[in-house]
Amino acid sequence: DLVRSRGLGDVYKRQVHGMAQRGGSVSTQVRWGDKVYGPVFGKGEADIMVALEKMEAVRYAEFLNPDGVAVINDYAIKSTTIASGAEEYPEGCIEAMQKNFKTIAVSASDIAIQLGNPKCMNVVLFGAMCDSLGCPEIDWEQIVAETVPAKVKELNLKAFRAGREAAKASK
């Protein structure tokens, strides 16, 4: 609705929750362009990936096109099997992504905690991602200000700016 309301084209999304309630993966596909007919894209077709956890970036890397950008939260969530010791968390997730894609790795969870609310981690990642969208004419900060509740507006603006700065430092 936000994209359409600003005359920026069509946008469609699809979410797959799978075993999310049991610590499993969640994926969302978003397609945005002048004319979009549906939300689904295939392997190697995504221009940008935003991963809220670094192992998830590797898990879904096959959807990113070779010139795509991976924006990754440098954070590990230990699944039940890893927490129990049955498996080990894989090392080198971000490095593996850097070998194949332009990668922006930021400690979004840590930044959100430093700002006082871990729930704003997604806004930190949004800030880290926005310059990769190739839309300099869009005032993303204004969009954040207009779309979040007034009581958390300043927090979200700080999170957005911190994400943008972290992305610049990551390059």
Predicted regions and their residues:
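Structural motif
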Residues: G9-D10, Q29, D47-M49, G68-V71, ...
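N-terminal beta-loop-helix "entrance" segment that forms/cooperates
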Residues: K13-F41
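Glycine-rich phosphate-binding loop
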Residues: V36-A76
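Aromatic-enriched
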Residues: A96-V123, A128-K171
